[in-house]
Amino acid sequence: RQRQMCIRDRPSENEVDEYYLTGWEGNPLSSFAGLLNITQVHDVVVTGEGTLDCDAQNGDWWVNPKVKRIAWRPRAVAMVDSENVCLHGITVQNSYSWTIHPIFVKHLDLLNFNINNPYNAPNTDGIDPESCEYTRIIGVNIHVGDDCIAMKASKVFLGMKLKKSCEHTVI
């Protein structure tokens, strides 16, 4: 049996998803789907010793990163409007942009895993919880060239509509 699994992917620019998997400054944005997309689900556990490798360094995701190409760069792990989600023991690396971006997630556990992105990769934050409740970030090793953890309260469109910040967070 294989003890370690490595998932690699390079999303095609022709694959456009109609869901909003990400946002920027509180505005929902269209983006390409990342390797792991958790949307409107509950009771999800992703655990093990495997690696989610976005392999972004071998594509053109970091060339002109502020230019939209059909849709914006994906997050490695996108979570939207979900509840009771746990990531445990995995490694996530070489993200296209922000590595883990939960939006409106309740009861989120990010436990004992690794995030590895090159120090010169543009805007590849580690973890960016946005408007989440009851979040625990414990034992996570983050090696990136940008923000390790950036707590966000949706502003602009979502902030004006929902007035929701991050609450009850343990780091």
Segments predicted by a language model, with ranges:
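Short, small-residue-biased leader/transition segments that mark boundaries at the very start
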Residues: 2-7
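Short, charged, surface-exposed secondary-structure boundary motifs
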Residues: 8-15, 111, 160-161
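Extracellular beta-strand/beta-solenoid scaffold signature
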Residues: 15-36, 60-77, 94-98, 121-128, ...
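Sequence/structural signature of small/polar-enriched beta-strand/turn repeats
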Residues: 37-38, 52, 56
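Right-handed parallel beta-helix
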Residues: 42-51, 83-94, 106-117, 125, ...
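Ligand-site clamp/hinge motif
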Residues: 80
